[in-house]
Amino acid sequence: MQTVLIALLRFYKLAVSPLLGSRCRFYPSCSDYAREAIQYHGAARGTYLAARRLCRCHPFSAGGIDLVPPPNSDARNAPHEAEASSHRL
């Protein structure tokens, strides 16, 4: 399942993303974040982390640096929008 999800993300990044342009307010981009989250945490938790990130990426978000939490950390300790906004690009 992990391989399928990463393949879908690669397809999105190569085929769809160039048509839409760069709109992500965070670093790394949401698609890169999702790929890393799935690689580090597996399909289920990685998808959950990616979905949380997508919910934070909107026009009213300040954005900033939001890295995937380390594999042994709790997702509740991940940087939130308020913390990420203090690390603007």
UniProtKB/Swiss-Prot annotation:
Region of interest (Disordered), residue spans: 68-89
Function comment: Could be involved in insertion of integral membrane proteins into the membrane.
Q: Name the PANTHER family for this protein.
A: MEMBRANE PROTEIN INSERTION EFFICIENCY FACTOR-RELATED (PTHR33383:SF1)
Protein name, entry field? Putative membrane protein insertion efficiency factor
Which HAMAP family does the entry link to? Answer: UPF0161_YidD
Give the source lineage, highest ranks first: Bacteria, Pseudomonadati, Pseudomonadota, Betaproteobacteria, Burkholderiales
**Where is this chain primarily localised?**
membrane
Name the keywords, alphabetized: Cell inner membrane, Cell membrane, Membrane
Q: Where is the protein localized?
A: Cell inner membrane
Comp. bias regions, Basic and acidic residues: 77-89
Among Pfam families, the record links this protein to:
YidD
| Membrane topology of the entry | Peripheral membrane protein
Annotated GO CC locations: plasma membrane
Q: Which family does it belong to?
A: Belongs to the UPF0161 family.
